[in-house]
Amino acid sequence: MTDSADTPQVELSEQGLNAAADAAEKAFAEAANLEELAAARREHLGDDAPIPAARRSLGSLPKDQRKDAGRLVNMARGRVEKRFAQVKAELERKRNEEVLRAERIDVTEPTTRGQRGAQHPITILSEQIADIFVGMGWEIADGPEVEAEYFNFDSLNFIPDHPARTLQDTFHIAPEGSGQVLRTHTSPVQMRTMLSRDLPIYIACPGRVFRTDELDATHTPVFHQVEGLAVDKGLTMAHLKGTLDHLAKTLFGEEAKTRIRPNYFPFTEPSAEVDVWFADKKGGAGWIEWGGCGMVNPNVLIAAGVDPEEYSGFAFGMGIERTLQFRNGLPDMRDMVEGDVRFTLPFGVRR
């Protein structure tokens, strides 16, 4: 506690209290900012300041003098408090004006050109492929990512114990037995389209799919596919091959070509793998496996309510990430999902 000898004394008279108030008002007027004003207030209205000290000394006066002396103390303190509030309001107004001036934006001032963002390379390639099919007169179709097992497997001629149905290959939606999965391909979109549209059908189905793969240089559990489906009268493998050739030449250059090799898929018969030949960016050229294709299995057409004696169809599908990977000579698929700007800068960002 501060010793009473250290406390500034003020005469308990109108003249003495006015002098203390004058000193406080002078200190407030000299404050250049709110911090200095707060310091001046502590000096003149704090516990050890003259006017508060005078209030505490009222008890030492004779009773008949306390009322008048108390009135004088209150008048002095009220005068000082009023002046403090006025000065504080003025300093706050000046501070706010300074802040507004500092934050003012000159809309006529030329701006520096910054780096512009753009779409991810996977999105760019997906849209390029979609544009190719739209240019051929095809439609773009989409469907749910959480899919019924019926559309993902049963309607596409997968037998009940097919390995693709297991937990080792497919994400099943809880609870067990719900009959729902994260779609493993975009083929369910083809079945949904055949059930909901009139024939003929020519659709491309780009989209995200899910499989229980570990993320490594050539695999990712979440990736993108584009699948195509055509159902019409008189379609053959020749129409399929011509479509694949057009897609390859548009994506990889006029020198690109495709070949098909026999394979097996439940939803096509006959089925084939499709390879693409093109000149890469390093000056080399060669064949590389691209995707799967074939004529739509009659069982799939029947499940969609299509008469296989009157209509035929072909289908194909390939991975977007894989296409981007070998088209652009990318050694590691993980670069596509890790969001590293050093990867996206050459593809999805333009200055």
Curated annotation (Swiss-Prot):
Keywords: Aminoacyl-tRNA synthetase, ATP-binding, Cytoplasm, Ligase, Magnesium, Metal-binding, Nucleotide-binding, Protein biosynthesis. Its main location: cytoplasm. InterPro entries: aa-tRNA-synth_II, aa-tRNA-synth_II/BPL/LPL, Phe-tRNA-synth_IIc_asu, Phe-tRNA_ligase_II_N, Phe_tRNA_ligase_alpha1_bac, Phenylalanyl-tRNA_Synthase, tRNA-bd_arm. Residues 45-69 are annotated as: Disordered. It holds the Pfam family tRNA-synt_2d. Binds 2 magnesium ions per tetramer. It comes from the Bacteria. It is found in: Cytoplasm. Its cofactor is Mg(2+). It catalyses: tRNA(Phe) + L-phenylalanine + ATP = L-phenylalanyl-tRNA(Phe) + AMP + diphosphate + H(+). Its EC number is 6.1.1.20. Signal peptide: none annotated. Mg(2+) binds at E269. GO terms for molecular function: ATP binding; magnesium ion binding; phenylalanine-tRNA ligase activity; tRNA binding. Transmembrane segments: none annotated. GO terms for biological process: phenylalanyl-tRNA aminoacylation. One of its GO terms (cellular component) is cytoplasm. Belongs to the class-II aminoacyl-tRNA synthetase family. Phe-tRNA synthetase alpha subunit type 1 subfamily. Tetramer of two alpha and two beta subunits. This is Phenylalanine--tRNA ligase alpha subunit. It comes from Corynebacterium jeikeium (strain K411). The lineage of its organism: Bacteria, Bacillati, Actinomycetota, Actinomycetes, Mycobacteriales.
